[in-house]
Amino acid sequence: MRLCRYSTPIAYNLSPLTYQVTISHNSNSMGIGYSNVQCYLTRHSNYMKGLVIKSIGTSYGVYFEDGTTADCHVKGNFRIRGIRSTNPVAIGDYVEVITNEDGTNWITELYDRKNYIIRRVTNLSYASHILAANVDMAALIVTINHPKTSTTFIDRFLATCEAYRVPACLIFNKIDLLNEEELQELASLRQLYESLDYPTYAISALRLQESELTKLFQNRITLLSGNSGVGKSTLLNAILGKDIARTGAISSAHHKGMHTTTFSEMYPIEGSGVQEERGSGGSGSWIIDTPGIKGFGLLDVEKEEIGHYFRDIFHFSHDCRYSNCLHTGEPGCAVYQAVAEGEIALSRYESYLSILDDTQERKYR
């Protein structure tokens, strides 16, 4: 039997495990509801339920309700059990672990996810990699320059979050390095995405102080993502109050960042209550650090559905003449007309077309 984590308070008396689940619904500064799950586990025999907080190759670091962690592995037949991804187990997954007599730990079951977010596998465009599961919020770190984050990358990230039901926000970093023209570009981008109800923040991670951004990470599991070199590691260190992640330089030749994070890991935020809650199984505040990302994509999505994951395009699509309109110049296309009249940003429409091209070529199928 699987553990239900999304209904009203419920208790299970199971053998060999006993679970008690308490669900509390909260709101946050973004206006997004989320569930803060507290699970109490009674250890029995050599089975235990845990939370995956680290992933290195085929090895997973699992955090248990009693505050201990262990290195765990996945059995081969588990990896191909209907999971279309290079990694069937991801950061943020709740798993069941069995310890053998020789002391090795094996993940034997993956509990249902409330959501997850994927990226494209480099040089293997038809495959996906799950960045994290059970995420309360995904934050994309964006830079106007040093290096430049493209609007296509931003829109692919947001569309992916929409498709997999992950609330998202944008954090514009390195604003202290911007000139007047770049500051105007920053203001325009913030206005664009805030008009679509995506929260945006403008910061300098090197000068990060107590602010609404700090509160953004409280009482939730947050995924930090972005291109290499956008200052993700610097921001992570500032939030955690210590040097956890290595920071890197920008390539002078290509103006791109060099990878400093090589694997995904989840960190507790000190002072958020997570330390006190660990013993009782509370979720507290966590940040998931991921390696620099080069591309996002949609998996198992029909081309007619892509517009559903662009809030502006979806809004105007209701007025299209044909229900299966792809918004590429069909007669009576309200989206195409909205782009021509400036009601949909051209950059957003071009991002939509790029994903549509990928889907038609079955790159993510």
How should these model regions be labeled?
Residues 38-162:
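C-terminal effector/interaction modules appended to NTPase cores
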Residues 47, 58, 84-101, 112-131, ...:
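Helix-rich effector regions associated with P-loop NTPase G domains
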Residues 135-142, 165-175, 197-202:
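Conserved beta-strand/loop subsegment of P-loop NTPase cores
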Residues 177-230:
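Canonical P-loop GTPase G-domain recognition
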